């Protein structure tokens, strides 16, 4: 059975672990536990063929900047996550996350993933952002960044309501299996 390695990166507390737990168990975790490094595996059927989707969670906190790239070798696709209600996490996509993964894995495809979309219409979240003269990130703004950074595409979801959640992983699988170049040369290799 072919394995697809999918590594999830992004700032701390944008919902990377919730995304993975909600997708793999259909349950939303009730408390925040910062991640050091976790992985999950699910079997998915694509075109009648079974694949193992290996999902690798990473810690977004700066303390792990030197440790995190150890999970990058052999990655088939990255999910670069930001919260649609955290402008700083969106900014870090281009300032930190895409430079980091493209430095280590220049040929590996990545998707830009907006998380926590259920909070985009939440009055108290909107009010908090407004106090700092900020507002939620719109899909159009994120799609433009995805194009500018040469992401495969922009997708968004809510791990809480599961809206768009399955689509994130379906698109990740498609990106990993897309054959623009021979498969072997697209996997991440640390030299």
From Swiss-Prot:
GO cellular component annotations of the record: centrosome; cytoplasm; lamellipodium membrane; membrane; midbody; mitotic spindle; spindle midzone
Membrane topology: Lipid-anchor; Peripheral membrane protein
PANTHER family hit by this protein: RHO FAMILY GTPASE (PTHR24072)
Lipid-anchored residues (S-geranylgeranyl cysteine): 188
Keyword Transport: no
Location of Cysteine methyl ester modifications: 188
Annotated function: Plasma membrane-associated small GTPase which cycles between an active GTP-bound and an inactive GDP-bound state. In active state binds to a variety of effector proteins to regulate cellular responses. Involved in epithelial cell polarization processes. Regulates the bipolar attachment of spindle microtubules to kinetochores before chromosome congression in metaphase. Regulates cell migration. In neurons, plays a role in the extension and maintenance of the formation of filopodia, thin and actin-rich surface projections.
Keyword Endoplasmic reticulum found: no
A biological process term (GO) from this entry: positive regulation of substrate adhesion-dependent cell spreading
CDD domains: Cdc42
Post-translational modification summary for this protein: Phosphorylated by SRC in an EGF-dependent manner, this stimulates the binding of the Rho-GDP dissociation inhibitor RhoGDI.
EC number: 3.6.5.2
Name of protein: Cell division control protein 42 homolog
SMART domains given in the database record: RAB (SM00175), RAS (SM00173), RHO (SM00174)
Modified residues (Phosphotyrosine): 64
Reactions performed catalytically: GTP + H2O = GDP + phosphate + H(+)
TM region(s), chain numbering: none
Entry keyword set: Cell membrane, Cell projection, Cytoplasm, Cytoskeleton, Differentiation, GTP-binding, Hydrolase, Lipoprotein, Membrane, Methylation, Neurogenesis, Nucleotide-binding, Phosphoprotein, Prenylation
InterPro entries xrefs: Cdc42, P-loop_NTPase, Small_GTP-bd, Small_GTPase, Small_GTPase_Rho
């Amino acid at each position: 059975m072919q394995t697809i390695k999918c590594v999830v990166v992004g700032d701390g507390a944008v919902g990377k672990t919730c995304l993975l737990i909600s997708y793999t168990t259909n349950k939303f975790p009730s408390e925040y536990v910062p991640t050091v490094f976790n992985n999950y595996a699910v079997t998915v059927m694509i075109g009648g063929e079974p694949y193992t989707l290996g999902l690798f969670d990473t810690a977004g906190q700066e303390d792990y900047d030197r440790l995190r790239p150890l999970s990058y070798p052999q990655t088939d696709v990255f999910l670069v996550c930001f919260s649609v209600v955290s402008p700083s996490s969106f900014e870090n996509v281009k300032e930190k996350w895409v430079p980091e993964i493209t430095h280590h894995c220049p040929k590996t495809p990545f998707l830009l993933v907006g998380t926590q979309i259920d909070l985009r219409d939440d009055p108290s979240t909107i009010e908090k952002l407004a106090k700092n003269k900020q507002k939620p990130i719109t899909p159009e703004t994120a799609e433009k960044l995805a194009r500018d950074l040469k992401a495969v595409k922009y997708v968004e979801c809510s791990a809480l309501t599961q809206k768009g959640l399955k689509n994130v992983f379906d698109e990740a699988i498609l990106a990993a299996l897309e054959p623009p170049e021979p498969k072997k040369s697209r996997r991440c290799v640390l030299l």
